[in-house]
Structures are given as structure tokens and as C-alpha cells.
From Swiss-Prot:
It comes from Thermus thermophilus (strain ATCC BAA-163 / DSM 7039 / HB27). Belongs to the acetylglutamate kinase family. ArgB subfamily. GO terms for biological process: arginine biosynthetic process via ornithine; L-arginine biosynthetic process. The lineage of its organism: Bacteria, Thermotogati, Deinococcota, Deinococci, Thermales. Its EC number is 2.7.2.8. The gene is argB. This is Acetylglutamate kinase. Keywords: Amino-acid biosynthesis, Arginine biosynthesis, ATP-binding, Cytoplasm, Kinase, Nucleotide-binding, Transferase. It holds the Pfam family AA_kinase. PANTHER family: N-ACETYLGLUTAMATE SYNTHASE, N-ACETYLGLUTAMATE SYNTHASE, MITOCHONDRIAL. Catalyzes the ATP-dependent phosphorylation of N-acetyl-L-glutamate. It comes from the Bacteria. It is found in: Cytoplasm.
Length: 248
């Protein structure tokens, strides 16, 4: 059996057919954490709300939280349907279900938080019954739901499961020269990442992607990788032929 993986997928459903094909065909166990950025932004805009971000995190006032949750749940249900139609039985959940994601608020951002505890029992029960869980990044504190960055939520869940984390993005990995495929870094350590940041090799939009992978390692994942979400990517990552793998 192929290795069990935690896979973080984006929230855009445009062009998702190939990605759904890839996930449905993977022979090993999967837990998926999904975002919902495009859907959230679209719904907020329709209702007259402005999207604001601080440090890459969506500011979520209490009056916007229900909209955020609705958009995430719609995204999860559509992804679950797509996988199920392809023969991989999937269920869309959030951290509210069985209280599986407990969070701590970042009050300067409204109802935004970070995951402090993961209850993996529900996920393990579903996996044992042959289901693939899809988890929306909503956590709970004493006051109610919190909007959590999907990348950091994915890292926390991977660590709690003790599974590798694969972050599927729009980039193929870390390259010394993005125009030269021969310069891909197949493996990196946190120390090497810091050196590449200092050299300006890892910069701009690549920084949060790499930080998400490193946060998964800190949470307890045995390894993490970033790779482009395309057909055949998961097996290629396992073979070391695609993406960049991060290890301690």
C-alpha cells in the first residue's frame, strides 16, 4: 500500500478535474485539508464586504464568519462529491465536527485563530471505514468557531496523525533558477531554507509556502513537501521526482 498522506489542496474549483482525478486514484489513505479563498472572497463581495488580509491571514470580523464558513462548506461538499463520483468515498467536515480542531483566537484579526489541539479519533474512524475525510479549517474556542489558515491547519493535522504533509500549490517546488528545471531542490532542511532566504532564492510568495511545510515538521509530521497539483504528482513526490521535500 502507498504511504498515508495528509494533502492540503487549494479552494479553487476551477480546473479541479485533473486534481480530483489524481486524488481519487491515489492507492493509499488520504486526509485532505482544503482552503476556500476564491469562494470566500466571491461571497463576501456579493454581500458588500471587503476582503482584508494582515500577514497573509484573512481578517474575519464576527459578522463575516458565517459567510466564511458557508463558503468553506460549499467548497468541501463539492470536492467530496467530485471524489465520490470518481470512486473514492469522501466526507466533507470541519473542525466543529466531533470538536476535532481546538483553537486559540488571534483577536487582533477578529474571529481568526490557530490550532492548538487536534482530536484525530473521528478521522481515524472514517479512514478505518474506507472514507476519505476532507476537513475545512474551522477550529473552536470557548466562544465558538475560528477561521484558521488552511496551510497551518493542515500542518497541525499532519503532526497529530504523524503523517507526511503534501501541500499542493501552483508552483512545482523550490528552484535556484525557476526558469531552469534542472535547479530544483529535491530536499531541504530548515537550516538550508534560512540560507536560501538569505541569498534571495526563497522570496516573495514562495516564503509562506515553505513556512507552511516547516510548520508541519514542527507539529510532528515526518516530512513535508510542496509540489504542483497535477496528475501523477503524489506518486512522483514519493519517488523524489517532483516537488521539494522538507525534513529536519
Amino acid at each position: 500500500m502507498s504511504e498515508a498522506l495528509l494533502v492540503k489542496v487549494g479552494g479553487s474549483l476551477r480546473g479541479a478535474e485533473a486534481l480530483l482525478d489524481e486524488l481519487a486514484a491515489y492507492p493509499g489513505p488520504l486526509v485532505l485539508v482544503h482552503g476556500g479563498g476564491p469562494e470566500i472572497g466571491a461571497w463576501l463581495g456579493r454581500l458588500g464586504y471587503e476582503s482584508r488580509f494582515v500577514g497573509g491571514l484573512r481578517v474575519t470580523p464576527p459578522e463575516q464568519l458565517e459567510v466564511v464558513e458557508m463558503a468553506l462548506y460549499l467548497t468541501g461538499k463539492r470536492l467530496a462529491e467530485g471524489l465520490s463520483r470518481r470512486g473514492r468515498k469522501a466526507l466533507a467536515l470541519s473542525g466543529r465536527d466531533a470538536l476535532c480542531l481546538k483553537g486559540r483566537a488571534l483577536p487582533e484579526l477578529g474571529r481568526v485563530g490557530e490550532v492548538v489541539e487536534v482530536e484525530v479519533g473521528l478521522l481515524q474512524d472514517l479512514l478505518a471505514k474506507g472514507y476519505t475525510p476532507l476537513l475545512a479549517p474551522i477550529a473552536l474556542d470557548a466562544e465558538g468557531p475560528l477561521n484558521v489558515n488552511a496551510d497551518t491547519a493542515a500542518g497541525a493535522v499532519a503532526g497529530a496523525l504523524g503523517w507526511p504533509a503534501v501541500f499542493l500549490t501552483d508552483v512545482e517546488g523550490v528552484y535556484r533558477d525557476p526558469k531552469d528545471p534542472r535547479t530544483r531542490f529535491p530536499r531541504l532542511t530548515p537550516k538550508e531554507v534560512e540560507a536560501l532566504k538569505g541569498e534571495g532564492v526563497i522570496q516573495g510568495g514562495m516564503i509562506p509556502k515553505v513556512e507552511a511545510a516547516l510548520s508541519a515538521l514542527r507539529a510532528g509530521a515526518p516530512w513535508a513537501a510542496i509540489a504542483k497539483g497535477e496528475r501523477g504528482v503524489l506518486e512522483a513526490v514519493l519517488r523524489g521526482e517532483a516537488g521539494t521535500r522538507f525534513t529536519l
